[in-house]
């Protein structure tokens, strides 16, 4: 685990302890009962693939540790609506506050503003957080293999499955990929960002994609800015992408989403 992830785990475990003291598991389960059923995150991405289209997980992210504030005029419901209008298949919403200025209410508000399934984008360590995610309306959780043991990852995955949610398993290298493939989740995300150096390269996805059989759905994460980037990864059978910063910085988010998915030329021809 990197020093960055170790620091994150320290504050996350403090957050979890504080949350448990305020909101019990029974409270979370009561909140879950008031949520609409999971919308089918994996199913939505498969539908795009089967239709011969790129599947986009569009991210709602106010800030990041490496880039600082990304979008000053930050309104999750408006962004969710714009992403849906632009053709996104799913949402990813940051709920981590210290590093990304995220919040649970951003997830709930964004999901309520559209019909898209939503991922709780956060650092998951305990099953309590899985119950939080469902209570807030999430349809999917993220597991970062670099920060979890095999047993921890499986426990979190199984808890999510029990709640009807999907699980996106994130890897960055071959060793993490081998571990991820031991899990049953069909959603595998390849993060092109090195969490040690923050360098980003699409060659990470290109190197790891051949390790994965066709029964899994690969998601390219980080470093995807243009339709050409999507086409490049399509060459290694990656047709689904998680994109945040490059879209969040655009004034017209819906138009930027369409351009990413279909290309500037296709948009101009409309």
UniProtKB/Swiss-Prot annotation:
Top enzyme class: lyase
Listed InterPro entries: Aldolase_TIM, Indole-3-glycerol_P_synth, Indole-3-glycerol_P_synth_dom, Indole-3-GlycerolPSynthase_CS, RibuloseP-bd_barrel
EC number(s) recorded for this UniProt protein: 4.1.1.48
Catalytic activity: 1-(2-carboxyphenylamino)-1-deoxy-D-ribulose 5-phosphate + H(+) = (1S,2R)-1-C-(indol-3-yl)glycerol 3-phosphate + CO2 + H2O
Pfam families: IGPS
Pathway: Amino-acid biosynthesis; L-tryptophan biosynthesis; L-tryptophan from chorismate: step 4/5
Keyword presence, Amino-acid biosynthesis: yes
Disulfide bonds: none
Keywords for this protein: Amino-acid biosynthesis, Aromatic amino acid biosynthesis, Decarboxylase, Lyase, Tryptophan biosynthesis
Any one GO biological process: L-tryptophan biosynthetic process
Keyword Lyase: yes
Annotated CDD domains: IGPS (cd00331)
Signal peptide as annotated in the record: none
Family to which this protein belongs: Belongs to the TrpC family.
NCBIfam families: PRK00278.1-2, PRK00278.1-6, PRK00278.2-4
Database matches in PANTHER family: INDOLE-3-GLYCEROL-PHOSPHATE SYNTHASE (PTHR22854:SF2), TRYPTOPHAN BIOSYNTHESIS PROTEIN (PTHR22854)
Protein name: Indole-3-glycerol phosphate synthase
Source organism (scientific name): Rhizobium johnstonii (strain DSM 114642 / LMG 32736 / 3841)
